[in-house]
C-alpha cells in the first residue's frame, strides 16, 4: 500500500481543496425571448435549441 513520504502541509491541503467549492450556475440571455437559460440546454418554454425546434412547446394554462 502506498504511504506518503512527507506530511501534507495545511497550505498545500488548502490549495488542493480550493477547487472543491461549488460554483454558481451560468446563465445566458436567450436571443429570441430575452429570458435567462442555461448554456447548451434546451429552452423548455419554446422547445428550441440552437435555432431548431426540438420539443413541442408547453401550452401555458
Swiss-Prot record:
Residues 1-35 are annotated as: Disordered. The gene is rpmF. Transmembrane segments: none annotated. This is Large ribosomal subunit protein bL32. InterPro entries: Ribosomal_bL32, Ribosomal_bL32_bact, Ribosomal_zn-bd. GO terms for cellular component: large ribosomal subunit. Residues 1-16 have a biased composition (Basic residues). It comes from Agrobacterium fabrum (strain C58 / ATCC 33970) (Agrobacterium tumefaciens (strain C58)). It comes from the Bacteria. Belongs to the bacterial ribosomal protein bL32 family. GO terms for biological process: translation. NCBIfam families: rpmF_bact (TIGR01031). Keywords: Ribonucleoprotein, Ribosomal protein. SUPFAM superfamilies: Zn-binding ribosomal proteins. GO terms for molecular function: structural constituent of ribosome.
